[in-house]
Amino acid sequence: AHLRYLNNFETLGEIPIMGFNPYKDTPMANHPPSPLEEQLKIMAVTRIMYPEIRITVPTPTIGPKNVEYSLNAGANNLATVIADNYPLEVKGVGSPVCGNYDDVVSVINKLGLTPQTI
């Protein structure tokens, strides 16, 4: 029902899909993270319902090792890909503690895809 609601927006260009990850020292610190399988189902259904839309998945949240599953499920935009030498005083999506660029690019290349560079 929530995905159908998005039909109300004529200029919708992107649907970000990000599962819940608990952060320590927050009210939901002990709540379990969103299961990967549920996130992948949402990506696949979103791709079927919106074949032309950009589906964005933040790599620190999904984890570099799960990028392949996300792309196969229908995601076509990977957000928050961080260079290995980036100064990691970063807070936010996934609160990464190390860069993930090489891991993410390796998965993209393994799938026979070419990463877009900025």
Which residue stretches match the model-derived regions?
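Auxiliary Fe-S-binding modules of radical SAM enzymes
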Residues: 7-118
